[in-house]
Amino acid sequence: MRKKAAGGAERRPLKPRTEAAAAAPAGRAMPSDHSRMKLRRDCSRPSLQWYTRAQNKMRRPNLLLKDILKCTLLLFGVWILFYILKLNHTTEECDMKRMPYMDPDRIKRAQQYAQQVLQKECRPQFAKRSMAQLFGSRYSLDLPPFVTKVPAESEAEYKYDPPFGFRKFSGKVQTLLELLPEHDFPEHLRAKSCKHCVVIGSGGILHGLEMGHALNQFDVVIRLNNAPVEGYSEHVGNKTTIRMTYPEGAPLSDLEYYSSDLFVTVLFKSVDFNWLQAMVKNETLPFWVRLFFWKQVAEKIPLQPKQFRILNPVIIKETAFDILQYSEPQSRFWGRDKNVPTIGVIAVVLATHLCDEVSLAGFSYALNQPRTPLHYFDNLCMAAMNFQTMHNVTTETNFLLKLVREGVVRDLSGGIHSEF
């Protein structure tokens, strides 16, 4: 029965949904709930074509970065190859068999001059006082040569990163010092009232001078890096008091180490601490640590723990920033500023803190003579120095020249300034 709505209009009763579906015309089925939900999902999903385009756009930056990386690696490889080829070319030109003729008269004068230096009266504290007079407050009179204790965080040792300081490495320094039973200069050398010292460089100028006998007579003989004694003692002597080096520079041959040597280590980077710890403990350095060195390093150092020392990094800082007045280190994406002194110049400054009288032998950077032998023991030419990017050898030569001319040190081989 039909009911009338307000206003007199008829109101038909609602049919159930199933009936409505049945009343739909044939061939035109009403969408079900499942179909409507599927349709809604399909409408909200991006088309496959749009998705592919978006994915391709995301890939483009990645491909660009990969191309840039490939080009960078290629350029770096070409640079390394060029450096190696150039270095090998220089090596071939400076075979020791082609050494320039050594004037016998000059050899005799050099030997006589060395004997004269040794025979002169030793003047206590002369090197220190002369350096202080020459450089004023830029040279410290009371700077300890070796690390003897873990410095306080506020001390100068922690102002810079290695090699100028030990910032962020206090734990590693403490570990190393606990392994070393002795930290100072040996007692028998400290007890000597006045010491004559000689720093023997690696310069080719030593070859043929036959100064070995004279060099052996100095109280303290400081040798650098892997400069050999075996096979060259006639020219460079065979006495060694200090072997001063860094991991990559340490001699690989056991024959270059003597039971009385002090092995003074210069620490440049984090893995250098690991290497020194392994050497002191007579352990094998892990392979993954070796990957961080730029050349092969010694696997063992045949010395006792009491013979190892750590160079005070403030001596390097004093040499670089105060005396040579290099700029302080700046963070760079690649390479270094030329603000790291050579081991040789650092050793000269160290000698003024250790010794009363200081002499040099085997120092010479004749950059205007590119075919002059660089070392007394290998085939490298002086031209090889033009490819290194860490040291300013011109500034260092001027510094050594100043020391020799002012009488602070004496040049026994005449490579910096000849006085014979």
UniProtKB/Swiss-Prot annotation:
Residues 1-67 are cytoplasmic. It catalyses: a beta-D-Gal-(1->4)-beta-D-Glc-(1<->1)-Cer(d18:1(4E)) + CMP-N-acetyl-beta-neuraminate = a ganglioside GM3 (d18:1(4E)) + CMP + H(+); ganglioside GA2 (d18:1(4E)/18:0) + CMP-N-acetyl-beta-neuraminate = ganglioside GM2 (d18:1(4E)/18:0) + CMP + H(+); a beta-D-Gal-(1<->1')-ceramide + CMP-N-acetyl-beta-neuraminate = N-acetyl-alpha-neuraminosyl-(2->3)-beta-D-galactosyl-(1<->1')-ceramide + CMP + H(+); ganglioside GA1 (d18:1(4E)/18:0) + CMP-N-acetyl-beta-neuraminate = ganglioside GM1 (d18:1(4E)/18:0) + CMP + H(+). It is a single-pass type II membrane protein. InterPro entries: Glyco_trans_29, Glycosyltransferase_29, GT29-like_sf, Sialyl_trans. GO terms for molecular function: lactosylceramide alpha-2,3-sialyltransferase activity. Residues 9-18 have a biased composition (Basic and acidic residues). The keyword Membrane applies. The chain crosses the membrane at residues 68-88. Residues 89-420 are lumenal. Its EC number is 2.4.3.9. Glycans are attached at N238. GO terms for biological process: lipid metabolic process; protein glycosylation. Residues 1-39 are annotated as: Disordered. GO terms for cellular component: Golgi membrane. Residues 20-29 have a biased composition (Low complexity). Transfers the sialyl group (N-acetyl-alpha-neuraminyl or NeuAc) from CMP-NeuAc to the non-reducing terminal galactose (Gal) of glycosphingolipids forming gangliosides (important molecules involved in the regulation of multiple cellular processes, including cell proliferation and differentiation, apoptosis, embryogenesis, development, and oncogenesis). Belongs to the glycosyltransferase 29 family. This is Lactosylceramide alpha-2,3-sialyltransferase. It comes from Bos taurus (Bovine).
